[in-house]
């Protein structure tokens, strides 16, 4: 593809591009592995999109380009999947592609196709994932639907990835289609146990609980019943159980499990560096709305009050002391 075959409004881009690193238009910059189809224009455009010193030049070029020219630029950027990936996986490349999203449906169509071709790789990348997040905000309904379908298909892969879980959380938060939002919440809820035990997935469970969707919270609580105590011994698992205690319906599920375990296990949980926060929260929230459950916990914990004083459970012992003095 020759330069003459791709006229931009910025047709003099080669000559105008800043070249502080001494990279010529015919020599691809570091990070870009050219294919046989690569042209000097590909190399120059790569430099424009990824050079940390080219912010003002990029803004000026975009502001002076009409829709047709932006469409040609989008076509070139997405002409090869590896080339597109080499751009969006860089800090500045990701930011500048995000700036191009939403300019027109024709421009978005090129980017939508490019994202779909490498969806999982893009959405689990530290920088490229923000391109998907932005696309889900500005694309039209048809393109969003295509992306939603891909998100649902790969949702568990995203949830269990350190960068993908962040992208999935943002996508769920901003989801403007009730059907797909419910589908995503249901998928998280039905896989709550697996995700709660995953280093990244637990952040997704924590996040959806903060959305206070009653149906989702109920489903998560049901799917975690019988596992809440085990989760409470773990740092991030305890955060999930604490969130469940904040809503009465799911609180009952957790407290019933606490009351159903043997006293020795509850004592060990109350003395645990993470579990003690779960027990404290259970006491505080049951006291506000379910005194029957509250007194059940007090009676079950009281025989261990001396052991609790000499551990992470000292705060629980203080709560028990305050009620023993009142009685």
Curated annotation (Swiss-Prot):
Segments annotated as Pumilio repeats: 79-114, 115-149, 150-185, 186-222, 223-260, 261-295
Annotated keywords: Cytoplasm, Repeat, RNA-binding, Translation regulation
GO BP field: regulation of translation
PUM-HD domain ranges (all copies): 1-324
One cellular component term from this protein's GO annotations in UniProt: cytoplasm
Subcellular location, record wording: Cytoplasm
Residue runs in coiled coils: none
Gene Ontology molecular function, alphabetical: RNA binding
PROSITE patterns cross-referenced by the UniProt entry: PUM, PUM_HD
Main subcellular location of this protein, as a coarse class: cytoplasm
Role, per record: Sequence-specific RNA-binding protein that regulates translation and mRNA stability by binding the 3'-UTR of target mRNAs.
Domain notes: The pumilio repeats mediate the association with RNA by packing together to form a right-handed superhelix that approximates a half donut. The number as well as the specific sequence of the repeats determine the specificity for target mRNAs.
Name of this protein: Pumilio homolog 18
Annotated organism of origin: Arabidopsis thaliana (Mouse-ear cress)
Source lineage: Eukaryota, Viridiplantae, Streptophyta, Embryophyta, Tracheophyta
Gene, per the UniProt record: APUM18
């Amino acid at each position: 593809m020759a330069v003459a075959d791709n006229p931009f409004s910025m047709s003099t881009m080669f000559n105008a591009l800043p070249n502080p690193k001494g990279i010529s238009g015919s020599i691809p910059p570091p990070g870009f592995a050219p294919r046989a189809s690569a042209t000097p224009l590909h190399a120059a455009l790569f430099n424009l999109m990824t050079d940390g010193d080219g912010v003002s030049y990029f803004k000026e070029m975009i502001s002076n380009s009409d829709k047709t020219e932006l469409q040609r630029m989008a076509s070139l950027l997405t002409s090869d999947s590896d080339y597109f990936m080499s751009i969006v996986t860089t800090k500045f490349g990701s930011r500048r592609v995000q700036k191009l999203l939403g300019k027109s449906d024709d421009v978005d169509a090129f980017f939508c196709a490019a994202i779909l071709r490498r969806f999982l790789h893009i959405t689990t990348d530290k920088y490229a994932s923000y391109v998907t997040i932005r696309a889900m905000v500005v694309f039209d309904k048809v393109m969003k639907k295509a992306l939603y379908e891909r998100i649902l298909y790969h949702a568990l892969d995203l949830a269990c990835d350190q960068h993908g879980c962040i992208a999935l959380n943002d996508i769920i938060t901003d989801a403007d289609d009730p059907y797909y939002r419910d589908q995503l919440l249901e998928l998280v809820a039905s896989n709550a146990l697996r995700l709660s035990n995953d280093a990244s997935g637990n952040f997704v469970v924590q996040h959806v609980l903060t959305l206070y969707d009653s149906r989702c919270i109920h489903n998560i609580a049901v799917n975690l019943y019988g596992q809440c105590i085990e989760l409470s011994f773990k740092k991030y698992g305890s955060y999930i159980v604490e969130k469940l205690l904040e809503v009465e319906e799911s609180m009952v599920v957790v407290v019933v499990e606490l009351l159903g375990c043997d006293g020795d296990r509850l004592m060990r949980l109350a003395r645990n560096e993470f579990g003690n926060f779960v027990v404290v929260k259970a006491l505080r929230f049951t006291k506000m709305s379910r005194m029957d459950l509250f007194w059940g916990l007090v009676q079950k914990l009281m025989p261990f009050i001396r052991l609790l004083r000499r551990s992470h459970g000292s705060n629980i012992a203080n709560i028990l002391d305050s009620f023993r003095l009142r009685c």
